[in-house]
Amino acid sequence: KVLTIESLCSLIKDGTHQTPTYTEDTINGFKFLSSKDVMSKKIDWSDIKYIPSDLHEKLYAVVKPIKNDILMSKNGVNYGVAAVNDTDEVFDIYVSLALLRPKTDIINPVYFRSAINSPDTKRQFDSSIKGIGVPNLHLGEIKKTKILVPPVDKQNEYVSFVEQVDKSKYHGMFAFEMGVAA
């Protein structure tokens, strides 16, 4: 079936539209992600910013990311790039990210991420981009985007295959770096 992103999600929101006050306090501060922290398969936690706890409480009351949510970049050169939140970390998000909460009874989050990152979805995003200068995907356009959705058992097979390929790539790179590969 072909379904809209909106029909595949129980929640679609973006982060705060206010530029936050950041803190250097990584102990008491809370992680704050923007589009620069989302790669095509994962969240890059290596260079994130932090916000004070009082601001976190306000933001977290509105958007509360949970494990298996999809974080998708809405603007900038990486617009349309999605990653699965595979952690129970508590964090907040900026307006440059959309949070998509998949209905896991009809779509596997890892399959959903792959479908969003596909060339077909990128073409749909390209045709609905708003803004001169910095590209911007509006939530309304994201919701209307169509995704090919096979039965869940086929999605799960796909995910198992992709994970096995990723493991093979990792082991191959590790062996090469260790000088084991011929």
List each model region and its residues.
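Non-catalytic DNA-recognition/assembly elements of restriction-modification systems
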Residues: 1-16, 144, 148-182
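A short glycine-rich beta-alpha junction/loop motif
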Residues: 75, 90-98, 107-110, 130-156
